[in-house]
């Protein structure tokens, strides 16, 4: 440790800092390494209040960790970024970034300057992304809907729902396709936020289902209300339907006790008048984000209107978008009157209540404006339902990215090995100091297939060697039959090498490209650091006499 010069804290410099950073990053990568791939293992995480999470989703594992080391925090943020941008590949991006750092650190120990390594890594990442787009990408149009289902299955293969991937892949693809929309620029988008996920304990995961409509996990305000309404006109309110109360601070002087009853009566009359105006506008379903008292409920029952109260504002906004309704925050007009117009109402074909497990749910089908979908997840217990939810989120993101980018690549380590062989040849063409960095970059790419094979209890060295031989033959030959070998990847269940495009092991091209870019950028960010100053925490002394 270097002596501090007027600094109230610790200062580390040079190789000590780099070794320290690499050790911290490798520690994080080793936590998630065994969870990679279809044979990956799960992690049990217990937080400070004793809540248990069982998962093998890299982003979820790292989100639960309370990481102290600043370099390790960069890697945790890297997995969150991958989760946000792509939704899948969070584990592999962390493992790749850690391997790049480890190899870069070895080069620095051998007197290669960090700037040369950084330049080499940037060149290698750029060349790798170009090669994926030009040689490895396969158009979704060529493979059809089957490509989407296979991409979803590949995402699920490492998750708890892997054995039921035939059911869930169909659900996911149908859900994403049902929320298809075209924005103002004319681009086709698949906003998966419009896919509502409802979790309900009980029965098997095979009883999970897709609902082409919107589902709310709530029930009617009163059991006397209708359970089904056809041609629903929906009023969306962001205020309560309780008895009218005067504001705090207003005083009323009552001379006659009989007038107290008149005040109570008037309070109820104002509420009834509000309900009447909404119903006269044509509403037969009233949804509010606040309360609805017995007076309003009784009036709605008599009018044959379904009422829902305390609905989450997030759900209210989604319903407004789907049904074409307007969220009304007040009935008051600038003139001081109270008005509710028919144009505020949303529309859908039918609204009905149905029990799902122990919970009652309200279903909205045939929405007027935007398409929406809901997935009802069933499962034995809370842990299982939560893990299915996380798995479906990843798969929804994968299918969305596949549809929006229009390209997939073979999985099972095929891309990493192909890039490794390509970059080896590319490194030999460089006559600069960056050659060693590019060579180490292509060696680092081998970590993904090696970890995949090791987690599946296979001989990683033998399998990766076979795979490298096939990809080398593919890239060095003009024979169309040998060119097809570029799609070869690992078959982890049998411990063989196979054509993963024919086997249906596919991943979105965007996922691979962003993984490479993010991992390289994170490694470069940490590699640039050669000095770390950690200030001592300030001791705030309490004034005398206070404890």
Curated annotation (Swiss-Prot):
CDD domains: TCP1_alpha. One of its GO terms (cellular component) is cytoplasm. GO terms for molecular function: ATP binding; ATP hydrolysis activity; ATP-dependent protein folding chaperone; unfolded protein binding. Signal peptide: none annotated. Keywords: ATP-binding, Chaperone, Cytoplasm, Nucleotide-binding. It is found in: Cytoplasm. Its main location: cytoplasm. PROSITE patterns: TCP1_1, TCP1_2, TCP1_3. SUPFAM superfamilies: GroEL apical domain-like, GroEL equatorial domain-like, GroEL-intermediate domain like. Belongs to the TCP-1 chaperonin family. Molecular chaperone; assists the folding of proteins upon ATP hydrolysis. Known to play a role, in vitro, in the folding of actin and tubulin. This is T-complex protein 1 subunit alpha. It comes from Tetrahymena pyriformis.
